[in-house]
From Swiss-Prot:
Family statement: Belongs to the OXA1/ALB3/YidC family. Type 1 subfamily.
The protein, known as: Membrane protein insertase YidC
Source species of the chain: Shewanella baltica (strain OS155 / ATCC BAA-1091)
Localization per record: Cell inner membrane
Main location: membrane
Keyword Membrane set for record: yes
Length: 541
C-alpha cells in the first residue's frame, strides 16, 4: 500500500510542479526601479536622445551604403554603415536545423521582423540621436574575413563631422569567441570642448515565445545592475513601464531560449539600463554610459562589449560575473549547477550526451540506494503490520484519537517509520526538476544525439518510443508491488491509470528527460528485486 501511495505522491508532485511553473510564467514579479546615489546623475542624461526604434529595413540602406560583411570562425555579421549597427548575425558553428547546413541566425532585419544591435554617441555633441539622425560612416572595405593564423579582426568605420571632428568606430572580433568589442575614438580637432555619451541597445520586434507548459522557453529582455544581479524583463513589462536604472557596470540583453544578445559596458563605468517599446511594436533594451567631456585637441576612447551567441556559461562568465545567470535554472539552481557540471564531466569521457544522462541516472540511484533499501524495508514492515492495524481499527472504531495513539505506539514498538517510504521519492523530485531545467536551458544539449532514432535529446521523441517504454516500466513497477486488501478501491483505480497519465505527460517532454526517468525505473526495478530477495530471507514480504 505504501508503494502505491508513493506513486500517487509522485503524480501529485509532478502535476503541482507543472502548475507552479505555469503560474510563475503568468505571475512573475515585476522589478522595481532603484537608483544608486553613486551614479544618479547618469540616470537621466540625454535619455530622449537615444534613437527611437525603426520598423522594417531603414531607407538609409541603399546602393551607396552597402552593408559591411564580416566573417570569422564563429560569426557571420553584417554592419550597416549608417550608424554602425549590427543588422545581421549568424552563428557559424550552430545550425538552424539539425539536418541542414544553414547556420543559426540570431540577429536580422527584414520587412516583417527586426532584431538588431544598435550603438552610437548621444549627448550635446553626439552624432546619433532621434533629432539629428545617424552618422554615415565610411570604411576602407565592405568585406572583412578573419584569416588563418589571425586571432583578432578589426573593422574600422570613420565619420568626420561638420566641425572637423573625426569619430572612429572600431569593431574588434576574436577567434573562437562570440563577443565583439565596440570602441569609439574621438579626436577633437575643433576649438570647442565636446560632450558625448555612448549608448548600446538591442531592438526586437515583439514576438510571442514558442513556449508550452512542458517546454517553457523565454523570449524577452533581461538586465543586471549592482542592486539586481539578474532580472528578466518581459515584453509585457516593457510595454507597461520603461526601465531607467542607474548602476555601476551592469548589462542589458535579449534572450531567446538557448541564445542571448547582450550589451556589456565597462564594469567600473556609471551606466543607466533602460528599456522602451515603440508604437510600431519594437522593444528596446540597452544602456547609456557615462558622459565624457573632451577638451579641444584631446582624444577620448570609449568602449563597450557586445555578445551574440549561445548561452555558454564559461564564455559568459569570462565577460561578466553575472552574465552567465541568463542560463536560468530556476529556484533549484544550486542543484542544477552541479548536475550540469557532472553531465559535462561524463560527456567528456563517453562522448555521448545520452550516455552521460544514463551515467547521471546511475549516480543518483546509487547515492539514493541506502534510502531506497530503507524505503522497501519500511514498506515490508508496514505490510506485516496490517493484521495488527486492522485489529486496532476494530478495537477503537470511530475513536480516531485513541486509535492514532495506539498506532504510534505500535510503530514505535516495531521500529517502523510510516513515512519512511516517502523520503526517497521526495528526494528524487528536486533532482528530476533540476535535471529538467538543465536539459531545457543548457545549449550544449541542443541538437545533441543519443543513438538510433534519437537525434536531439533536447526535444521530444519523434516516435514517442521512450515515453511508451517509460509507461511500460511504470506498469511493471506497479505490478511488482502487492496491493493491500485494505486499500481504498478509488486509490486502486487511480493507481491503474498512473502509468497511462504519466505516459501522456511525457510524450512532449525532452527525450533526454524521458531517458533519465526510463533508466531510473529500470534501475529501480532491479534494485527492487535485489532488496525483496534480501527481505524474503529475513522473513519480510
Amino acid at each position: 500500500m505504501e508503494s502505491q501511495r508513493n506513486i500517487l505522491l509522485i503524480g501529485l508532485l509532478f502535476v503541482s510542479f507543472l502548475l507552479w511553473q505555469q503560474w510563475q510564467a503568468d505571475k512573475a514579479p515585476k522589478p522595481v526601479a532603484t537608483e544608486s546615489s553613486l551614479v544618479a546623475n547618469a540616470a537621466n542624461s540625454h535619455s530622449a536622445d537615444v534613437p527611437e526604434a525603426d520598423t522594417g529595413v531603414p531607407a538609409a540602406v541603399t546602393a551607396t551604403s552597402k552593408l559591411i560583411t564580416v566573417k570569422t570562425d564563429q560569426l557571420d555579421v553584417q554592419i550597416n554603415p549608417i550608424g554602425g549597427d549590427i543588422v545581421f548575425a549568424a552563428l557559424v558553428s550552430h545550425k538552424m536545423e539539425q539536418d541542414k547546413d544553414q547556420p543559426f541566425v540570431l540577429l536580422e532585419q527584414t520587412k516583417d521582423f527586426t532584431y538588431i544591435a544598435q550603438s552610437g554617441l548621444i549627448g550635446r555633441d553626439g552624432i546619433d540621436s532621434s533629432a539629428k539622425g545617424r552618422a554615415a560612416f565610411s570604411t576602407a572595405a565592405t568585406e572583412y574575413t578573419l584569416a588563418e593564423g589571425q586571432d583578432t579582426l578589426e573593422v574600422p568605420l570613420t565619420y568626420v563631422a561638420d566641425n572637423g571632428v573625426t569619430y572612429t568606430k572600431v569593431f574588434v572580433f576574436h577567434r573562437g569567441k562570440f563577443n565583439v568589442d565596440v570602441d569609439y575614438k574621438i579626436n577633437n580637432t575643433s576649438a570647442a570642448p565636446l560632450q558625448v555619451q555612448m549608448y548600446g541597445q538591442i531592438k526586437q520586434t515583439i514576438k510571442p515565445s514558442e513556449s508550452s507548459m512542458v517546454m517553457p522557453t523565454y523570449r524577452g529582455g533581461a538586465f543586471s545592475t549592482q542592486d539586481v544581479r539578474y532580472e528578466k524583463y518581459k515584453f509585457d513589462d516593457m510595454a507597461k513601464s520603461n526601465l531607467n536604472q542607474a548602476t555601476l557596470g551592469g548589462w542589458a540583453a535579449m534572450l531567446q531560449h538557448y541564445f542571448v544578445s547582450a550589451w556589456i559596458p565597462p564594469a567600473t563605468d556609471s551606466n543607466t539600463i533602460f528599456s522602451s517599446v515603440s508604437a510600431g511594436g519594437l522593444a528596446n533594451i540597452g544602456f547609456r554610459g557615462a558622459v565624457y567631456d573632451i577638451a579641444p585637441g584631446a582624444t577620448q576612447e570609449i568602449s563597450s562589449q557586445f555578445y551574440v551567441g549561445p548561452k555558454d556559461q564559461k564564455a559568459l562568465s569570462a565577460i561578466s560575473d553575472t552574465l552567465n545567470l541568463v542560463v536560468d535554472y530556476g529556484f533549484l539552481w544550486w542543484l542544477a549547477v552541479p548536475i550540469h557540471w557532472l553531465l559535462m564531466f561524463y560527456q567528456s569521457f563517453v562522448g555521448n550526451w545520452g550516455m552521460a544522462i544514463i551515467l547521471i541516472t546511475l549516480t543518483v540511484r546509487g547515492l539514493l540506494f541506502p534510502l531506497t533499501k530503507a524505503q522497501y524495508t519500511s514498506m515490508a514492515k508496514m505490510r506485516n503490520l496490517q493484521p495488527k492495524l486492522t485489529d486496532l481499527k476494530e478495537r477503537f472504531g470511530d475513536d480516531r484519537q485513541k486509535m492514532g495513539q495506539a498506532m504510534m505506539e505500535l510503530y514505535k514498538k516495531e521500529k517502523v517509520n510510516p513515512m519512511g517510504g516517502c523520503l526517497p521519492i521526495i528526494l528524487q523530485m528536486p533532482i528530476f526538476i533540476a535535471l529538467y531545467w538543465v536539459l531545457l536551458e543548457s545549449f550544449e544539449l541542443r541538437h545533441a544525439p543519443f543513438m538510433l532514432w534519437i537525434h536531439d535529446l533536447s526535444v521530444q521523441d519523434p516516435y514517442y518510443i521512450l515515453p511508451l517504454l517509460m509507461g511500460v516500466s511504470m506498469f511493471v513497477m506497479q505490478k511488482m508491488q502487492p496491493i493491500a486488501p485494505t486499500m481504498d478501491p478509488m486509490q486502486v483505480k487511480m493507481m491503474q491509470w498512473m502509468p497511462v497519465i504519466f505516459t501522456v505527460f511525457f510524450l512532449w517532454f525532452p527525450a533526454g528527460l524521458v531517458l533519465y526517468w526510463l533508466v531510473g525505473n529500470i534501475v529501480a526495478i532491479t534494485q527492487q528485486k535485489i532488496i525483496y530477495a534480501g527481505l524474503a530471507k529475513k522473513g519480510l514480504k
